[in-house]
Design a protein with these regions (language model features):
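A glycine-rich, hydrophobic loop/mini-helix early in the fold
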Residues: 1
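Accessory terminal and edge-of-domain segments that mediate assembly/interaction
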Residues: 6-127
Length: 127
């Protein structure tokens, strides 16, 4: 399973969970961040609860909740690639993240300037 986990200040970390002792040892050997505790809900939680006899692995990337997070997706793919050694190219997602983040910053700046202008006009009207 691949999921995002809300983080107020994402640092690009990906946490991994498994119910298999053998897989846990492999994850540790590869330097993966092992999930110590978390609140997991939805289909992933259901799968985890029902997987008593089936080994599972979950990758949980820190994300900015509420906006598409290409950077978190790239970090999740990077972690999966590190674990499986598939040589997946995650760089296009990082490029897309840069483009999206730049557009988002420009939009926020534009909205901020519009709000300041609106406030200035309101003060001019009352003052």
């Amino acid at each position: 399973s691949i999921e995002g986990v809300n983080s107020p200040n994402p640092q690009g970390r990906v946490y991994v969970y498994t119910n298999s002792k053998d897989e846990l040892e492999q994850l540790r050997k590869k330097g993966m961040n092992i999930m110590q505790e978390a609140m997991i809900v939805g289909p992933t939680a259901a799968l985890m609860l029902l997987s008593h006899n089936t080994p599972i692995i979950g990758f949980f990337a820190e994300t900015n909740i509420g906006i598409p997070d290409s950077r978190a997706a790239a970090e999740a793919i990077k972690a999966i690639d590190k674990y499986l050694g598939l040589k997946i190219d995650y760089k296009p997602l990082l490029k897309q993240a840069e483009i999206f983040e730049k557009s988002l910053r420009e939009l926020i700046d534009k909205a901020s300037r519009a709000q300041e202008e609106k406030e200035k006009k309101r003060l001019d009207y009352f003052g």
